[in-house]
């Protein structure tokens, strides 16, 4: 309801006067939104979720729906889904931390819902930083609490990368044929120096990567090292070529005693 009615955390931003433009006749004052009710409400939601995630899938679904409706995919713009005033930073990031807790608890079975919620969380976080910085209007105690909330969100966000599983990056089965078609179309349009460079670069790259296949049968240690140096000795450096690991640097030579590119 507060989202639709634009109350508290979701209220429209009031344009504040520039303190540098103040005069004796006009003394500008900050216009922070009233977010104390949302502070209390989100505190309750955080505590309730810690119980619900163990015993009530219905309540978890309500939490998921509430978070989805409270956040937006938009970043920046004249009107944000939440008030960007510095006084609203505490409840905003406490709500976002609750969203990450919901994802980390692995209680939402639908992968699409999880992915959309994660994207909304990040978008809403970035949206706060799309406006110019402002001087805090909170009291000392509340400001310390808000900073602590942001640190907790950062910690939760930093650990969120382990929930981006490899299965999300697996390409579809039919992409192989399309890839070959695109490669043929792109390389077929090359001619002259461009085609010569393409052939030199990928010939050199294929020979370097093939070294791994050559040394794979050898056990780790001196035998594998000798096999590696032996395979590298057969590779001739081509002029103007680079390695994918460092495309901005041109390989001038290879130290065949250590295998280090130079």
Curated annotation (Swiss-Prot):
It holds the Pfam family PI4K_N. The gene is PI4KAP1. Residues 180-262 are annotated as: Pleckstrin homology (PH) domain conferring phosphoinositide binding specificity. Disulfide bonds: none annotated. Belongs to the PI3/PI4-kinase family. Type III PI4K subfamily. It comes from Homo sapiens (Human). It comes from the Eukaryota. This is Putative inactive phosphatidylinositol 4-kinase alpha-like protein P1.
């Amino acid at each position: 309801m507060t989202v639709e009615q634009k109350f508290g955390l979701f209220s429209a931003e009031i344009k504040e006067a520039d303190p540098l433009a103040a005069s004796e006749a006009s003394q500008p004052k900050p216009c922070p939104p009233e977010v104390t009710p949302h502070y209390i409400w989100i505190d309750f939601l955080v505590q309730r979720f810690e119980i619900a995630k163990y015993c009530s899938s219905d309540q978890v679904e309500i939490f998921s729906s509430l978070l989805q409706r409270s956040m937006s995919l938009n970043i920046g713009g004249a009107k944000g889904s939440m008030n960007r005033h510095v006084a609203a930073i505490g409840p905003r990031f406490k709500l976002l931390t609750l969203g990450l807790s919901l994802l980390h608890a692995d209680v939402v079975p639908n992968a699409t819902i999880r992915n959309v919620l994660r994207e909304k969380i990040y978008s809403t976080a970035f949206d706060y930083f799309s406006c110019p910085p402002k001087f805090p209007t909170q009291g000392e105690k509340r400001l310390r609490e808000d900073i602590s909330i942001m640190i907790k969100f950062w910690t939760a966000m930093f650990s969120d990368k382990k929930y981006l599983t490899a299965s999300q990056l697996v390409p579809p089965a039919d992409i192989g044929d399309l890839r070959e078609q695109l490669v043929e179309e792109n390389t077929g349009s090359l001619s002259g120096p461009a085609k010569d460079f393409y052939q030199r670069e990928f010939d050199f790259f294929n020979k370097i990567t093939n070294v791994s296949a050559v040394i794979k049968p050898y056990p780790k240690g001196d035998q594998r090292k000798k096999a590696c140096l032996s395979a590298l000795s057969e590779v001739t450096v081509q002029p103007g070529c680079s390695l994918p690991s460092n495309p901005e640097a041109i390989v001038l030579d290879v130290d065949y005693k250590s295998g280090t590119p130079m």
